[in-house]
From Swiss-Prot:
This is Large ribosomal subunit protein bL35. InterPro entries: Ribosomal_bL35, Ribosomal_bL35-like, Ribosomal_bL35_CS, Ribosomal_bL35_sf. It comes from the Bacteria. GO terms for molecular function: structural constituent of ribosome.
Length: 66
């Protein structure tokens, strides 16, 4: 049986930590930020951990090696 390939869309969007948590970048920073406060924009920086239920789905369906 051939190796399982990771879905390339998931590869670009998610990262799995050493402890098995799934990290993702928060949405809402592409355009229209003139309406947001500086604090809101600052809080969207960096990465966030995905909730456990969603993380399980991501690992199961999109990242076969994760």
């Amino acid at each position: 049986m051939p190796k399982l390939k990771t879905k390339s869309g998931a590869k670009k969007r998610f990262k799995i930590t050493g402890t098995g948590k799934v990290l993702y970048a928060q949405a809402g920073k592409r355009h229209g930020m003139i309406k947001r406060t500086t604090k809101q924009i600052r809080n969207l920086r960096g990465t966030t951990t995905l909730f456990e239920g969603d993380a399980a789905n991501v690992k199961k369906f999109f990242l076969p090696n994760g």
